[in-house]
Amino acid sequence: MGNVCIGPRRNFAKNGLLGILRPRHAAPSSPSQPTTTSRSIPVVLPSAPSSKPPPPTQTAPPVPVVISEPPPPQPQPEPQPAAPSQPPPPQEQPSPPPPASSNTTQQPPPPQQRQQSRAKKPAHIKRISSAGLQVESVLRRKTENLKDKYSLGRKLGQGQFGTTYLCVDKANGGEYACKSIAKRKLLTDEDVEDVRREIQIMHHLAGHPNIISIRGAYEDAVAVHVVMELCAGGELFDRIVRKGHYTERQAAGLARVIVAVVESCHSLGVMHRDLKPENFLFVGNEEDAPLKTIDFGLSMFFRPGEVFTDVVGSPYYVAPEVLKKSYGQEADVWSAGVIIYILLCGVPPFWAETEQGIFEQVLHGTLDFESDPWPNVSDGAKDLLRKVLVRDPKKRLTAHEVLCHPWLQMSGSAPDKPLDSAVLSRLRQFSAMNKLKKMALRVIAENLSEEEIAGLKEMFKMMDTDNSGQINYEELKAGLERVGANMKESEIYQLMQAADIDNSGTIDYGEFIAATLHLNKVEREDHLYAAFQYFDKDGSGYITSDELQQACDEFGIEDVRLEDMIGEVDQDNDGRIDYNEFVAMMQKTTTGFGKKGGHNFSGFRDALKSHS
């Protein structure tokens, strides 16, 4: 479930508003992990404000924005206090009660405006009067018992829907974080679907160095447990509070990480929708510790051109088009721009005493580049912010264009242009694999859970425009173009041939999943062993040429040289493949043909991530 979302409240809790509203001398919070709190309710805005509010540095009060649950009552204008020339001293106040949730739909429509309608009650959910929903199964599959594999330790964080604990792997002593979501608190069908989608998205984004990695999801009668990477270094939020603001070089380095995450999400068809400093954690306490993005509770799968209407996010970071209830993935870029602004000066670009005032400033306020420390900030940084914090999303830079901006290249470590998309990179690596490895990935893909491949399923449907269950050359070409992957026709043809394992001339669903699967899946011993057993038909512990021929027949692969296939993997030259040789082949890093950019993503999948 998501963190804190826009809603009718007066309290300014740390998780809901910028940490700048806390005193800069305040002690940083303890190391945190993603928690589960409330979702959003609609924000009702006047169709036309009576007058344009002054910039934050002026003293005239902002025109209030009315926040109410629909149908909205007729608002009575209330005078607002005059905005001070600088943000007021921060105050910690209790977190607000959770607002009512907005509706979402699981199946995305064609690239048109998404209608928010209440989903029908699934058959596996029973409604009871005293406890909202009685959920029989959230994950819709039987899972292992969490406590058979992990020991739960101290509490790391608390949210509206659940609690995050330290957990230890009983097998190897590794430390992780476990977010336990209480099923009794999932009051609506949408709450249940949101939990499923968050897990699906975490699996879909797996492997990115700056996105928190998921270890697995478990379910018992009481809760859904999500085990993930432990980030013990605390929030980016707290470091901003501690520092006041970063040096320009430090800010550029963090900005690159944040925007690269946004670009990767967009290229894989995911919109985060709640980017803010609280949702970035450091792995450790070191100054140069890696930064990880967390909390995908408000995130959605999207298709190019799709329009969303539900108002979600956090007040200081929400894009103006979100408040106007018509937005797409460009809203994430606005939120990233707000974070960059804060990194450079320590205060948000649009602020006021109340949420109503904040929303009005987001819609109509003026960027302040006059107050300290802006006279000492480079023109390049200000140029980037002017191009990111532009209210017309069509004129706003994309995440890819932000990464290519000269200011983010000032340290010399910016990515080369053009960047590969996440999917294009995976496609290219897949194309360079030997046939045995491709077949093994197909076996692994067919045994993955629904939540692990849900994102890839959405991408397949996006590319399969005629709903035939097959992607032909023209559909692959159009799909790559939609996500900004500019490729020569010869390259696309090579990718097509590489993914088409059975040489049918098209890419079917199973071939697409295998080719776009992130290779972190092959790190799991159970996946590797299951794949090896598929080829080792007689259970002898070896894959022989006869067994390999049988597997090729099952996959419809003809004209193969079995000796060459075995020879590529057979390290001891005994004419067969044992389990250790098989694992070495599967875990060997593969470099795709003509690979550009610095991505370490794998296979066919990265073909869809170039210019978001």
Swiss-Prot record:
Gene Ontology terms describing biological process: intracellular signal transduction
Domain EF-hand: start-end pairs: 451-486, 487-522, 523-558, 561-592
InterPro entries cross-referenced by the UniProt entry: CDPK_Ser/Thr_kinases, EF-hand-dom_pair, EF_Hand_1_Ca_BS, EF_hand_dom, Kinase-like_dom_sf, Prot_kinase_dom, Protein_kinase_ATP_BS, Ser/Thr_kinase_AS
Keyword flag ATP-binding: yes
Reactions catalysed: L-seryl-[protein] + ATP = O-phospho-L-seryl-[protein] + ADP + H(+); L-threonyl-[protein] + ATP = O-phospho-L-threonyl-[protein] + ADP + H(+)
Recorded GO MF terms: ATP binding; calcium ion binding; calcium-dependent protein serine/threonine kinase activity; calcium/calmodulin-dependent protein kinase activity; calmodulin binding; protein serine kinase activity
Region (Disordered): 23-132
Residues that bind Ca(2+) 1: 464, 466, 468, 470, 475
Family in the record: Belongs to the protein kinase superfamily. Ser/Thr protein kinase family. CDPK subfamily.
Protein name according to UniProt: Calcium-dependent protein kinase 27
Organism: Oryza sativa subsp. japonica
